[in-house]
Regions:
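Active-site cavity-forming subdomains of large catalytic enzyme subunits
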Residues: 1-166, 172, 197-207, 211-217, ...
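Extracellular interaction modules
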Residues: 188-197
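Core structural elements
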Residues: 16, 237-246, 257-274
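Hydrophobic face of alpha-helices
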Residues: 103, 230-233, 237, 268
């Protein structure tokens, strides 16, 4: 940051992740050093269902995220229904432990190292004013910013020998001739679909949404009367909104997200000097 301050990153994980136990230990001062990441800030994206299991002193199931990708795409009752369905699915890889044992490990690590940070997925999404255009997947390093984000993904375009074209999401299943189901991103020019030979496979990257913080503070040591606050706050809000339009953006997708959401935050500082 301007060559004077190191950057920092917070990594969020949901408590059903198979690697959650190792993740919690990332900043521990003891143990095997190669399994530590002291410059990262681990954080948990906790669901209501997990806390319910803790209160009930019941069991909690851990999954491989590759097998349950949609758990990260939902919250609330939808998450609960899918999670329980995966628990009952005998074909899914899983580990089971007491929810309270995992919670005790979280709290022990928190008191020892100050991490992981704790944020609550369902609470954040229930209060999301932009729930109609997406959902919140994590917070930031300071755990006060909650914005919609989306990962990058790819569209797969198959052009066949007869000149026809079909487009798929990369995870879509396609039954190729021979009866084998392949993900769209695994189909090649050696395959045929519905009797049509694939000629060209093209991959198009679709940018996701990256949250941007547009922040400022009012210095209460200088601005502290009712008249001053009523005068300065509207100006500060307009200034922050102007910054969105005038700012330099290192990535195209960052600019697109900021222009779309126009999220701003105005805080205060200098209370001790009032």
């Amino acid at each position: 940051q301007l060559g004077t301050r190191k950057g920092a990153i917070a990594v969020y994980m949901e408590p059903w992740h198979m690697d959650i136990m190792d993740f919690i230990d990332l900043k521990k001062n003891s143990g095997e050093e190669r399994r530590r990441a002291h410059d990262l800030f681990p954080a948990l994206w906790i669901t209501d269902l997990f806390m319910e299991r803790v209160l009930e002193d019941s069991y909690w199931t851990l999954f491989d995220p590759y097998e349950v990708k949609d758990l990260s795409e939902c919250y609330g009752d939808e998450f609960k229904a899918k999670y329980i369905a995966y628990e009952e699915d005998a074909t899914i890889t899983k580990n089971t432990m007491k929810a309270k044992d995992l919670w005790k490990k979280v709290l022990t690590s928190y008191f020892e190292s100050g991490s992981p940070f704790l944020c609550f997925k369902d609470t954040a999404n229930r209060a999301n004013p932009n729930a109609h255009v997406g959902h919140i997947r994590s917070s930031n390093l300071c755990t006060e910013i909650f914005q919609n984000t989306n990962p990058n993904h790819y569209k797969i375009k198959l052009e066949f020998m007869d000149g026809t074209i079909s487009t798929y999401e990369e995870e879509d299943l396609i039954v190729v001739d021979g009866g084998i189901a392949k993900k769209a991103n695994k189909v090649s020019a050696l395959d045929s679909v519905n009797g049509k030979r694939v000629f060209i496979v093209e991959k198009e990257k679709i940018d996701g949404d990256t949250a941007v913080c547009n922040l400022a503070s009012v210095n209460l040591s200088r601005i502290n009367t009712k008249e001053d606050i009523e005068r300065v706050v509207p100006i500060a809000i307009r200034m922050l909104d102007n910054v969105i339009d005038l700012n330099f953006y290192p990535l195209r997708k960052v600019k697109a997200t900021n222009l779309k959401s126009r999220s701003i935050g105005l805080g205060v500082m200098g209370e001790a000097e009032m």
